[in-house]
A protein has these predicted regions:
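Membrane translocator/pore-forming domains, dominated by Gram-negative outer-membrane beta-barrels
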Residues: 13-23, 50-327
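Outer-membrane beta-barrel biogenesis signature
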Residues: 4-52
């Protein structure tokens, strides 16, 4: 009998193309960048030992964030720069040495996201231009040295012009807006005092309510983008360690700060009815280092740099410089 022919192996299956367009990641990158753009904590406004009653502050902040979306199918790299300006409108001292402060603030910022999808040669870019208006209120138990308890709150409204464009595609534009409100408290304890300097440690807790609304959008090709509106709660637990002079307020004050961020920003959108989310982890851990000091009698400057990391290859690098002018 004729032997059976050897079986021919099946050819290797062709790799499946990515289920996602890179534009999907650009939309999600814009969504996250807008919500993060104007978020801040009390120390970002330049608090320091023996601050004067009235002051105006300016903060320039830049950050670079790398993250995934759609369970790792999308890769996003976002760069954001913001400028925030604020001024005290009212300062009221208490009979026990404390102080209340009330001020207003405004901000402007822009971000750019580059998005790629697994198995897709093309790229997409997302851009956000943002603007904010808000107010803040602060109480210090010890206004002169800022020892003991403090409480800070702020609220702001922001609006954004967004755009997304894939390689060779028509640019898509849409608008969004957001509201945020923050409550923060902490306690500054001095220790290790020498004849001229002392150490301070300051545990901090902050809770932020975040509301983000994005208008529905139909792309030129007919794709429907919806569902980018929701609210969320975020928290930050941290501790700040610094070393400062107790005899000369003009010397430099170095500091280091460790933070644990918990909670997610609004993180999903619907693309032709299919919901896609970013992969930002629930818990993120960060470290910031910086220094503050006087540049002139009524001018204080500061600078800081830091990084946050988390699961799903999440990384965030940031740097900021600020100036406060007292009157």
């Amino acid at each position: 009998p004729v032997p059976d022919p050897e079986p021919v192996p099946d050819p290797a299956p062709a790799p499946d193309p990515s289920l996602y367009r890179p534009e999907t990641g650009a939309y999600l990158g814009n969504q996250l960048a807008a919500q993060r753009m104007f978020t801040l904590q009390l120390n970002d406004r330049g608090t320091a030992q023996k601050s004067n009653d009235e002051h105006t502050w300016l903060l320039i902040h830049s950050e670079a964030t790398s993250l995934n979306a759609a369970d790792g199918e999308l890769s996003l790299d976002t760069n954001t720069t913001t400028l925030q300006l604020g001024t005290n409108l009212l300062t009221e001292d208490t009979t026990q040495g404390g102080q209340y402060q009330l001020g207003i603030m405004a901000g402007i910022g822009d971000s750019k996201t580059k998005s790629t999808a697994d198995g897709n040669y093309y790229r997409a870019t997302g851009k956000v231009n943002g603007y904010s208006l808000g107010a803040y209120a602060t109480w210090y138990q010890d206004a002169k040295y800022q020892k003991g308890w403090y409480a800070d709150s702020w609220a702001q409204y922001a609006w954004f012009d967004n755009s997304v464009q894939g390689d060779g595609q028509h640019p898509e534009s849409y608008r969004s807006q957001g509201v945020q409100a923050s409550v923060e408290t902490g306690y500054l304890l001095a220790f290790g005092q020498s004849s001229s300097r002392e150490w301070t440690v300051e545990p901090q807790v902050q809770v932020i309510y975040n509301r983000y609304d994005s208008e529905n959008h139909t792309e030129t090709n007919g794709s429907r983008i919806t569902g980018g509106s929701d609210d969320s709660m975020l928290s930050r637990t941290g501790v700040r360690l610094s070393n400062r002079s107790i005899t000369d307020n003009n010397t430099l004050i170095p500091y280091v700060e460790a933070n644990w961020e918990n909670g997610r920003y609004v993180d999903s959108m619907n693309f032709n009815g299919d919901t896609v989310s970013n992969d930002v982890p629930e818990n993120r851990y960060g470290l910031r280092v910086g220094v503050t000091g006087k540049a002139a009698k009524n001018i204080r400057i500061w600078g800081q740099a830091g990084s946050y990391v988390g699961e799903n290859d999440y990384t965030n690098y940031q740097a900021a410089v600020g100036i406060k002018v007292s009157f």
